[in-house]
């Protein structure tokens, strides 16, 4: 499958296209992982439920960047605020994450944040769990339709 062309890409290396088995290994290897949940994931009930199961299975801390009632998806925090804390290697929710998972945000926003993190924190493993490929992450799912994307999330959770 050819990778989509991204006119904003400023780095020569791109994200590894990863599926559920590889992502499971990456998640298990992390000591302190952080999930940043955006508005698209909050609005889609099935996506949101799968993320809550994924968070429980891999013991991830979570930050929700969208208005959401409840704290199932973590503390409310803006994506820029979370990115600034990550770039400065400051604790986010009391931990110094070694893995950050972006899901549910717009692709251009996710890409910009990941470009900044790639420059400021090369030691941080960055994963994009969106239906669109994100070249600035270390690992990203390929561009797929919503149904295939949810199947990948189900495979990650083990459903």
UniProtKB/Swiss-Prot annotation:
Heterotetramer of two alpha and two epsilon subunits. The ACDS complex is made up of alpha, epsilon, beta, gamma and delta subunits with a probable stoichiometry of (alpha(2)epsilon(2))(4)-beta(8)-(gamma(1)delta(1))(8). Part of a complex that catalyzes the reversible cleavage of acetyl-CoA, allowing autotrophic growth from CO(2). The alpha-epsilon subcomponent functions as a carbon monoxide dehydrogenase. The precise role of the epsilon subunit is unclear; it may have a stabilizing role within the alpha(2)epsilon(2) component and/or be involved in electron transfer to FAD during a potential FAD-mediated CO oxidation. GO terms for biological process: methanogenesis, from acetate. This is Acetyl-CoA decarbonylase/synthase complex subunit epsilon. It holds the Pfam family CO_dh. Belongs to the CdhB family. The gene is cdhB. The lineage of its organism: Archaea, Methanobacteriati, Methanobacteriota, Methanomada group, Methanopyri. Transmembrane segments: none annotated.
């Amino acid at each position: 499958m050819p990778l989509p062309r991204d006119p904003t890409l400023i780095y020569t290396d791109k994200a590894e296209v990863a599926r559920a088995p590889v992502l499971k290994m990456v998640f298990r290897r992390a000591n302190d992982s952080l999930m940043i949940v955006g508005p698209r994931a909050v609005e889609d009930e099935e996506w949101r439920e799968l993320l809550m199961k994924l968070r429980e299975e891999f013991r991830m801390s979570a930050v929700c960047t969208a208005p959401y009632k409840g704290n199932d998806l973590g503390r409310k925090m803006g994506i820029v605020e979370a990115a600034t804390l990550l770039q400065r290697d400051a604790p986010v929710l009391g931990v110094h994450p070694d893995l950050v998972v972006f899901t549910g945000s717009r692709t251009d926003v996710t890409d910009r944040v990941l470009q900044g993190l790639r420059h400021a924190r090369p030691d941080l493993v960055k994963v994009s769990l969106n239906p669109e490929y994100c070249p600035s992450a270390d690992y990203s799912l390929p561009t797929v339709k919503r149904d295939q994307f949810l199947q990948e999330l189900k495979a990650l959770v083990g459903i």
